[in-house]
Amino acid sequence: MPSNSKFRFSSEPEPHKLRTKQILASSPDVRNLISKNPFTIIPLVALVAGMVVISWLLKDSPWWLILLVAYTVGAFANHALFVMIHECSHNLLFKGKTLNFLASITANLPHVLPSAVSFTRYHRMHHVHQGNHELDADLPDFWEARVFGNNFFSKALWLLLFPFFQVRRTFRLKNIKPVDGWIITNWVFQFAFDAAIWIFFGPKALMFMLISFFFSVGLHPLGARWIQEHYLVLDENQETYSYYGPLNLLSFNVGYHNEHHDFPSIPWNKLPQLKQSAPSFYDTLKSHQSWTSLFFRFLFDKNVTLHSRILRDDKAKEKTIAIEDKGIKYY
């Protein structure tokens, strides 16, 4: 394993652009999987409605029950809605950006905190500039990785507060506007929704949603998804990993992360077909089978830290540009 006290630097290009070209050369029919899935709006709206109903049912419940339902039900619903926001960020529901933004803002509502539009901005940068610390907000800040070290308690705290650190990272992306019309729209809809839940259902209903959100991306087996995607847990030379476990059924195949990075224009329902269409490329890669197992390994394994990531230098950037195909959309 690489050192747990510093990032691993690489002068090589990120693996996805080259693999995309290779797969298209060997299996050109994969292009047929590139499409939109407007039917995704159905589970999206159903999940939002479900969270509203559950919050109403819990509005007068004891805190222990609110915490229990948030951990066992709300976290899964909010995680699925985060995946819906992710789909919208790649314009995978509808052709126009406007409808995708509106869908993502709708999916954002049970999260309590407005993040859908800003996520779209920095997530696309992550795809284009993977491993570039100044442009990839998926990478921990240098101070963040140093402060939280390799012990159980600090890593548990990091997972618990993950949303705050994710927001903080976006400030280092200088070429993204912190505020624009769509971000303001996101805020207006979000805070109006929050106010309505508070006024008509009460503070416990809103807190149920907020707690569910923090569990969905943090101190919960679902939070292991952030470790699964790019942390050097299984191989110091493989920086992206897929997850093929059963929770993909509840998470709209978000575990198919290598497949998604290779072809971000393929919607969630067709990612398994992509894997089946290119077995020589994907079956040879290491992958995770359990988020729960990875969750505990991250917490207890001192060799897995926030430094377990690959950073790229300028030489890697030049090599990446050299292999890019202008006919392929990489975000």
Predicted regions and their residues:
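Histidine-centered catalytic micro-motifs
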Residues: L81-H90, F119-G131, R225-L234, L250-I266, ...
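Short acidic-hydrophobic sequence patches enriched in Asp/Glu that either
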Residues: K95-L102, S118, F215, K270
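Transmembrane alpha-helical segments that form the membrane-embedded catalytic/substrate-channel core
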Residues: V73-I85, S115-V117, P163-V167, M209-E236, ...
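Membrane-cytosol interface motif
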Residues: F101-L109, Q238-S251
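Non-catalytic, topology-defining segments of multipass membrane proteins
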Residues: M1-G74, M84, L109-M209, N269-K270, ...
